[in-house]
Protein backbone atom coordinates (compact mmCIF):
# COMPACT_ATOMS: atom_id res chain seq x y z
CA UNK A 1 0.00 0.00 0.00
CA UNK A 2 2.81 2.42 0.87
CA UNK A 3 4.57 1.64 -2.42
CA UNK A 4 1.46 2.37 -4.43
CA UNK A 5 0.86 5.70 -2.72
CA UNK A 6 4.45 6.84 -3.03
CA UNK A 7 4.75 5.82 -6.69
CA UNK A 8 1.56 7.67 -7.60
CA UNK A 9 2.76 10.74 -5.72
CA UNK A 10 6.11 10.72 -7.56
CA UNK A 11 4.46 10.56 -10.99
CA UNK A 12 2.15 13.46 -10.21
CA UNK A 13 4.90 15.64 -8.78
CA UNK A 14 7.33 14.91 -11.63
CA UNK A 15 4.81 16.35 -14.06
CA UNK A 16 4.74 19.61 -12.11
CA UNK A 17 8.32 19.95 -10.94
CA UNK A 18 11.29 18.06 -9.52
CA UNK A 19 10.27 15.14 -7.29
CA UNK A 20 13.43 15.28 -5.16
CA UNK A 21 12.87 18.96 -4.42
CA UNK A 22 9.23 18.31 -3.54
CA UNK A 23 10.31 15.57 -1.14
CA UNK A 24 12.93 17.80 0.48
CA UNK A 25 10.29 20.48 1.02
CA UNK A 26 7.99 17.86 2.57
CA UNK A 27 10.72 16.96 5.07
CA UNK A 28 11.38 20.61 5.91
CA UNK A 29 7.64 21.18 6.39
CA UNK A 30 7.42 18.15 8.70
CA UNK A 31 10.23 19.54 10.87
CA UNK A 32 8.74 23.03 10.81
CA UNK A 33 5.40 21.68 12.06
CA UNK A 34 6.98 20.18 15.20
CA UNK A 35 8.08 22.09 18.29
CA UNK A 36 10.66 19.39 19.13
CA UNK A 37 13.21 17.46 17.02
CA UNK A 38 11.81 14.48 15.10
CA UNK A 39 13.29 11.05 14.50
CA UNK A 40 13.26 9.18 11.21
CA UNK A 41 10.05 7.26 11.96
CA UNK A 42 8.19 10.46 12.86
CA UNK A 43 9.35 12.19 9.68
CA UNK A 44 8.29 9.15 7.66
CA UNK A 45 4.80 9.17 9.19
CA UNK A 46 4.44 12.91 8.58
CA UNK A 47 5.55 12.74 4.93
CA UNK A 48 4.55 9.19 3.84
CA UNK A 49 8.07 8.80 2.42
CA UNK A 50 10.33 5.77 2.82
CA UNK A 51 13.00 6.04 5.50
CA UNK A 52 15.69 5.27 2.91
CA UNK A 53 14.48 8.18 0.79
CA UNK A 54 14.38 10.49 3.80
CA UNK A 55 17.94 9.56 4.81
CA UNK A 56 19.33 10.40 1.37
CA UNK A 57 17.59 13.77 1.27
CA UNK A 58 18.46 14.57 4.88
CA UNK A 59 22.15 14.24 4.05
CA UNK A 60 21.85 16.98 1.42
CA UNK A 61 19.83 19.15 3.80
CA UNK A 62 22.41 18.61 6.56
CA UNK A 63 25.27 19.57 4.23
CA UNK A 64 23.48 22.81 3.28
CA UNK A 65 22.52 23.72 6.86
CA UNK A 66 18.77 23.43 6.31
CA UNK A 67 18.63 20.65 8.91
CA UNK A 68 20.75 19.76 11.95
CA UNK A 69 21.12 16.39 13.67
CA UNK A 70 20.17 16.34 17.35
CA UNK A 71 21.00 13.51 19.77
CA UNK A 72 22.38 11.36 16.92
CA UNK A 73 18.96 10.11 15.83
CA UNK A 74 16.73 13.20 15.68
CA UNK A 75 16.55 16.15 13.32
CA UNK A 76 15.51 19.81 13.53
CA UNK A 77 15.58 22.85 11.27
CA UNK A 78 19.05 24.32 10.80
CA UNK A 79 20.59 27.82 10.72
CA UNK A 80 20.10 28.27 6.98
CA UNK A 81 16.35 28.37 7.57
CA UNK A 82 16.82 31.24 10.03
CA UNK A 83 19.01 33.09 7.54
CA UNK A 84 16.32 32.74 4.89
CA UNK A 85 13.71 34.03 7.32
CA UNK A 86 15.80 37.08 8.16
CA UNK A 87 16.43 37.74 4.47
CA UNK A 88 12.71 37.47 3.79
CA UNK A 89 11.93 39.97 6.54
CA UNK A 90 14.47 42.45 5.17
CA UNK A 91 13.23 42.14 1.61
CA UNK A 92 9.47 41.92 2.23
CA UNK A 93 7.95 45.26 1.15
CA UNK A 94 4.60 44.43 2.77
CA UNK A 95 6.24 44.42 6.20
CA UNK A 96 7.07 48.12 5.91
CA UNK A 97 3.48 48.89 4.94
CA UNK A 98 1.55 46.67 7.34
CA UNK A 99 3.47 46.88 10.60
CA UNK A 100 3.21 50.68 11.10
CA UNK A 101 -0.55 50.56 10.52
CA UNK A 102 -0.92 47.56 12.82
CA UNK A 103 1.20 49.27 15.47
CA UNK A 104 -1.05 52.32 15.25
CA UNK A 105 -4.03 50.05 15.96
CA UNK A 106 -2.28 48.59 19.02
CA UNK A 107 -1.38 52.07 20.27
CA UNK A 108 -5.04 53.08 19.98
CA UNK A 109 -6.04 50.21 22.31
CA UNK A 110 -7.20 47.61 19.79
CA UNK A 111 -7.18 43.87 20.28
CA UNK A 112 -4.22 41.97 18.77
CA UNK A 113 -4.00 42.58 15.00
CA UNK A 114 -2.82 39.92 12.54
CA UNK A 115 -2.62 39.62 8.78
CA UNK A 116 -3.34 36.27 7.13
CA UNK A 117 -3.01 34.90 3.62
CA UNK A 118 -4.36 31.64 2.23
CA UNK A 119 -1.63 28.98 2.16
CA UNK A 120 -3.52 25.89 0.96
CA UNK A 121 -7.14 24.87 0.50
CA UNK A 122 -7.24 24.01 4.22
CA UNK A 123 -4.68 26.35 5.81
CA UNK A 124 -3.98 30.03 6.22
CA UNK A 125 -0.66 31.58 7.14
CA UNK A 126 -0.23 34.35 9.70
CA UNK A 127 2.13 36.71 7.89
CA UNK A 128 2.25 39.51 10.48
CA UNK A 129 1.19 39.68 14.12
CA UNK A 130 1.39 42.22 16.93
CA UNK A 131 0.13 41.62 20.46
CA UNK A 132 -2.23 44.13 22.03
CA UNK A 133 -1.49 46.04 25.20
CA UNK A 134 -4.15 43.96 27.02
CA UNK A 135 -3.80 40.46 28.35
CA UNK A 136 -4.55 37.95 25.62
CA UNK A 137 -5.35 34.24 25.42
CA UNK A 138 -4.89 34.18 21.67
CA UNK A 139 -1.32 32.93 21.25
CA UNK A 140 -0.83 33.43 17.52
CA UNK A 141 2.59 34.14 16.03
CA UNK A 142 3.82 35.26 12.62
CA UNK A 143 4.52 32.10 10.66
CA UNK A 144 1.77 30.04 12.29
CA UNK A 145 -0.45 27.95 10.04
CA UNK A 146 -4.09 27.90 11.08
CA UNK A 147 -7.22 26.21 9.72
CA UNK A 148 -8.82 28.31 7.00
CA UNK A 149 -12.30 27.00 7.79
CA UNK A 150 -12.32 28.31 11.35
CA UNK A 151 -11.90 31.87 12.55
CA UNK A 152 -12.81 35.29 11.17
CA UNK A 153 -9.72 35.65 8.97
CA UNK A 154 -10.38 32.25 7.44
CA UNK A 155 -13.96 33.22 6.63
CA UNK A 156 -12.75 36.33 4.80
CA UNK A 157 -10.26 34.30 2.76
CA UNK A 158 -12.98 31.81 1.82
CA UNK A 159 -15.49 34.53 0.92
CA UNK A 160 -13.15 36.57 -1.30
CA UNK A 161 -10.69 33.92 -2.54
CA UNK A 162 -10.11 32.68 -6.07
CA UNK A 163 -12.92 30.17 -5.62
CA UNK A 164 -15.40 32.08 -3.43
CA UNK A 165 -17.40 29.90 -1.06
CA UNK A 166 -21.17 30.11 -1.28
CA UNK A 167 -23.86 30.45 1.38
CA UNK A 168 -25.70 33.10 3.36
CA UNK A 169 -22.81 33.81 5.72
CA UNK A 170 -20.34 34.17 2.84
CA UNK A 171 -22.74 36.50 1.01
CA UNK A 172 -23.03 38.66 4.13
CA UNK A 173 -19.24 38.81 4.48
CA UNK A 174 -18.86 39.88 0.84
CA UNK A 175 -21.55 42.51 1.27
CA UNK A 176 -20.06 44.09 4.41
CA UNK A 177 -16.35 43.21 3.97
CA UNK A 178 -16.48 41.98 7.55
CA UNK A 179 -16.47 38.64 9.38
CA UNK A 180 -16.80 37.66 13.02
CA UNK A 181 -15.93 34.45 14.84
CA UNK A 182 -16.87 33.68 18.44
CA UNK A 183 -15.15 30.65 19.95
CA UNK A 184 -14.73 28.72 16.71
CA UNK A 185 -10.98 28.11 16.69
CA UNK A 186 -10.62 28.42 20.48
CA UNK A 187 -13.68 28.41 22.73
CA UNK A 188 -12.23 31.20 24.88
CA UNK A 189 -11.24 33.48 22.00
CA UNK A 190 -12.99 35.58 19.38
CA UNK A 191 -12.03 37.61 16.36
CA UNK A 192 -13.15 39.91 13.59
CA UNK A 193 -11.59 40.35 10.15
CA UNK A 194 -11.75 42.42 6.97
CA UNK A 195 -10.28 41.83 3.50
CA UNK A 196 -7.32 43.74 2.08
CA UNK A 197 -7.22 44.17 -1.69
CA UNK A 198 -4.63 45.08 -4.31
CA UNK A 199 -4.99 46.56 -7.80
CA UNK A 200 -8.12 45.50 -9.68
CA UNK A 201 -9.49 44.62 -6.24
CA UNK A 202 -7.80 41.24 -6.02
CA UNK A 203 -7.74 39.79 -2.52
CA UNK A 204 -4.34 39.94 -0.84
CA UNK A 205 -5.36 38.63 2.59
CA UNK A 206 -7.34 39.24 5.76
CA UNK A 207 -6.60 41.76 8.51
CA UNK A 208 -7.96 40.59 11.86
CA UNK A 209 -8.34 41.47 15.54
CA UNK A 210 -8.40 38.63 18.06
CA UNK A 211 -8.53 38.27 21.82
CA UNK A 212 -10.55 36.91 24.76
CA UNK A 213 -14.19 36.32 23.88
CA UNK A 214 -15.48 38.44 26.76
CA UNK A 215 -14.01 41.52 25.08
CA UNK A 216 -16.09 40.91 21.95
CA UNK A 217 -19.52 41.98 23.19
CA UNK A 218 -21.79 43.57 20.52
CA UNK A 219 -20.81 47.13 21.47
CA UNK A 220 -17.11 46.17 21.37
CA UNK A 221 -17.49 44.54 17.97
CA UNK A 222 -19.27 47.58 16.53
CA UNK A 223 -16.48 49.87 17.72
CA UNK A 224 -13.72 47.57 16.46
CA UNK A 225 -15.49 47.09 13.13
CA UNK A 226 -14.97 50.76 12.29
CA UNK A 227 -11.28 50.55 13.17
CA UNK A 228 -10.56 47.41 11.20
CA UNK A 229 -12.45 48.57 8.11
CA UNK A 230 -10.58 51.88 8.21
CA UNK A 231 -7.22 50.10 8.49
CA UNK A 232 -8.08 47.58 5.76
CA UNK A 233 -9.24 50.46 3.56
CA UNK A 234 -5.99 52.37 4.16
CA UNK A 235 -3.91 49.31 3.28
CA UNK A 236 -5.98 48.68 0.15
CA UNK A 237 -5.48 52.28 -1.00
CA UNK A 238 -1.71 52.01 -0.44
CA UNK A 239 -1.70 48.81 -2.51
CA UNK A 240 -3.51 50.48 -5.42
CA UNK A 241 -6.99 49.14 -4.79
CA UNK A 242 -10.36 50.75 -4.07
CA UNK A 243 -12.17 49.56 -0.96
CA UNK A 244 -15.70 48.29 -1.74
CA UNK A 245 -17.42 49.71 1.38
Outline where the language-model segments fall.
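Juxtadomain coupling helices with adjacent low-complexity linkers
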Residues: 164-171, 175-182, 187-188, 206-245
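Short hydrophobic/aromatic beta-strand element in the GNAT-like acyltransferase core
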Residues: 114, 181, 193
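Glycine-rich acetyl-CoA-binding "A-motif" of GNAT/NAT acetyltransferases
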Residues: 203
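Amphipathic alpha-helical effector-binding/dimerization core
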Residues: 76-163
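Residue-level recognition of short loop/turn positions
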Residues: 121, 176, 199-200
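A short, hydrophobic, proline-anchored segment that marks a local hinge/packing element in signaling
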Residues: 192-199
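N-terminal helix-turn-helix
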Residues: 2-89, 234-238
Amino acid sequence: MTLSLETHDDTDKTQRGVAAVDRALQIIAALEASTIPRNLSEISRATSLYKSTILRILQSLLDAGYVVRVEESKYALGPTIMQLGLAYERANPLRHLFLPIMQKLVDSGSESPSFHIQQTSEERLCLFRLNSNHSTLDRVHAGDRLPVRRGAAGKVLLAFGEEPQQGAEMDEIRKNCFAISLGERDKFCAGIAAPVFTRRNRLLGALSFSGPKERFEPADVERMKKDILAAAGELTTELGGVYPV
